Design a protein with these regions (language model features):
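Conserved GHKL (Bergerat-fold) ATPase module
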Residues: 1-316
Length: 316
């Protein structure tokens, strides 16, 4: 609550106050706890009685309040109740976790979120496709502190927070809104073989290559492995010099995408072409994730090779 300024009148305070006294005095500790609890209580009343006025406070100081979720375990539940979020259900207006809980799907076991640098980029992330297709609301988190408090074991209404860019999607039990658009559960044998080819070609650039159940329209995306941190948290830790070695990402491939099926149908004569495509798919996933190709020169050469091949095929 460092954005709050005020005066406190107490007969128990000595006239001479030192920094050591502020840090060690039980009186100051009691005052701090009492004032903090009172302010949070008043904010809760304001949020309930005048949501528009509270929204203005959240616009200006929401990121600071969320620091308390990470640092103040005692008041975590109160701060979560006060928190407001942009979501896939409401990009223009703030939503509370109580609102989110009311829209949970029957088989939904977690509060899903995606973290990044800005809301506009998060809105178009391919990771959202499978969740949107099922009507599952996802929190859009764009403040740096978000990546830390969601990974600190916080939960709301008995539901943990789960990143949609980390590990498995857990969407199998939630039905699609449009049952006619449901892809086949079976994956073509040629696609399975192509995924194995991609994994072998990319080597240690990725930890795994696997079929995705979170992609609907996009061909590929990058996922953080179960054993590592969320993708955005990893970027923040690396930028602050607090990450010794980044975990190798998982490349998820949409096995029902027309491009993937077409590439999987290519014969052995197209080996070098398929090698270039495997690396281009990884670079595409990096770009969609907000990163750059690891080697821009090789990316350009491979792209030129694939485009030339496409033009020659079109003339035949």
């Amino acid at each position: 609550l460092r954005f709050v300024r005020g005066l406190i009148d107490s007969a128990d305070l000595p006239l001479n106050v030192s920094r050591e006294m502020i840090q060690e005095s039980p009186i100051f500790t009691a005052i701090q706890k009492g004032v903090t609890s009172r302010i949070l209580s008043e904010l809760g009343k304001l949020a309930a009685s005048a949501p528009e006025a509270y929204a203005k406070i959240w616009d200006n100081f929401g990121a600071v309040l969320k620091e308390g979720i990470y640092e103040d375990f005692e008041r975590r539940d109160a701060l979560l109740a006060l928190s407001r979020f942009k979501t896939t259900a409401s990009v223009n207006d703030w939503r509370s976790l109580k609102d989110y809980a009311a829209s949970l799907k029957e088989s939904q076991t977690a509060i899903y979120y995606i973290a990044g640098d800005n809301i506009a980029r998060l809105e178009v992330s391919p990771h959202l496709e499978g969740f949107r297709a099922r009507g599952v609301e996802v929190l859009l988190l764009a403040d740096p502190i978000d990546s830390f408090w969601v990974s600190s074991g916080a939960s709301f209404d008995g539901k943990p927070f789960k990143s949609i860019t980390h590990g498995s999607a857990d969407l199998a039990l939630i039905p699609l809104l449009d049952t006619n658009s449901k892809p086949s559960c079976e994956i073509d044998q040629s696609v399975t073989a192509f995924l194995s080819f991609i994994k072998a070609e990319l080597g240690d650039a990725v930890s795994d290559v696997r079929a995705s159940d979170r992609l609907m329209d996009s061909a590929v995306c990058l996922i953080a492995p179960e054993s590592g941190p969320d993708r955005q948290l990893e970027k923040l830790l690396a930028g602050a010099g607090r990450l010794k070695a980044a975990a190798k990402p998982v490349l998820e491939v949409n096995p029902h995408h027309s491009l993937i099926k077409a590439l999987a149908s290519l014969g052995d004569d197209d080996h070098s072409f398929k090698q270039d495509v495997a690396h281009l798919l990884l670079d595409e996933a990096r770009i969609l994730d907000g990163d750059r190709p690891e080697n821009p020169r090789k990316f350009g050469d491979r792209l030129a090779h694939v485009l030339r091949r496409s033009l020659l095929s079109a003339r035949v």
